[in-house]
């Protein structure tokens, strides 16, 4: 079931305002990836990126096209571990 727009906006607002919440959400995304829950980990990282630096800034930092980064973290994306670690490094 897709989340309502209001919920996503609420989470994004909290991420922008609360440093501890940002840190914990990023940690949760990484823990999901390490536990093998790739779908949840990618979704959490996507939300984190959208609410913080955005894909354009991540693209600048990683020197990878923003569309490639979005595709990598999409539900059908199948990123290599080194690419995920590179993204996490720049967050």
Show which residues each predicted segment covers:
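DNA major-groove recognition helix of helix-turn-helix/homeodomain DNA-binding modules
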Residues: 81-91
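N-terminal flexible/basic segments that precede or flank functional cores
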Residues: 1-44
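Short coil/turn segments at secondary-structure boundaries
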Residues: 27, 60-61
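Short basic helix-loop element that most often maps to the first helix and adjoining turn
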Residues: 42-58
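Juxtamembrane/interface motifs at transmembrane-helix termini
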Residues: 43-45, 61-62, 89-91
